[in-house]
Amino acid sequence: MRWREATTPTPADPGLADLTPDRRLRRLELTVTRRLDGLLHGQYRGLLPGPGSEPAGSREYRPGEDEVRRMDWAVTARTTVPHVREVDADRELTTWLLVDASPSMEYGTAELDKRELAVAAVAAVGFLTAGLGNRLGAQVLGPDGLRRHPARSGRTHLLGLLRTLLAAPRAGGYDETDVPPAGPDLADALDAVHRVATRRGLVVVVSDFLDGLPDDPAQEPPWERALRRLAVRHQVLAVEITDPRELELPDVGLITLVDPETGRRREVWTGDERLRERYAAAAAAQREQVRQAVRRSGATHLPLRTDRDWGADIVRHVRAQRRLAAAPAGANRGGAA
């Protein structure tokens, strides 16, 4: 379900879009620093539960305590006793970001649009993982293809990446006659990250995860297998970006909906209560489809909405993950839903 209202909504902060990229960057840095104050000096593992990322031998598997995905199959085969890989926290962490900048992210009816919220999430991840020589790289998926930013350390590199994301031209606005040819999709982008992220670390995927969702919820999305492959090697955080108008339609009469990927248009009478109910039910089923796919892949799920306090949501997530990381062995250590 990628239909969007044809009219461009007015953001809650109309001055933001009029600022230069450098001024927007300074405002974003200040906002992230204020909202995440007290967490910025924590260890990177606060983003996700569990151990670090450097191998440190193997030990016998303890049912109920260990994650099956850390099974050391080579040692298990050699000893005929199940073993898991032990890992120690890295002195230096490499984080890879996959940022979805496809046309479906160019939408918003609340405090931020989806693209701006995605950049805020990238900034939060960058500042939370910065320091001690940690490196940050990115793959940006846009309508013109996949653009790679090599992994480097330092605040200057992070700010340069954020400046690039803020200054990138807006995608979408097509009609059915000028849609560009199809480029890489989310599954392709995940595979690209898998190829460049050769050292075990942290992978953060920021997307609405709408790409290729099948109509049949029993079918897995085309990107699920690639996400699962990443989660075998890395700790993976899936940041899902949504807008309230993607979840329910207001009763505002006749509107024109536009598919931002194809330019297709459809007029809809929102005064039809049954139509609004069907829309809301379909949208809820779609979000559940994404949630289940992320869970099955082994990634941690962090949903963010344009109409919520994203800073508070990230803080709650980080604190919950730190509690999980500090829980004694044998306690319930399930990831965030």
Pin down the residues of each PLM region:
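Exposed, interaction-prone extracellular/peripheral surfaces
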Residues: 1-51, 57-71, 75, 84-120, ...
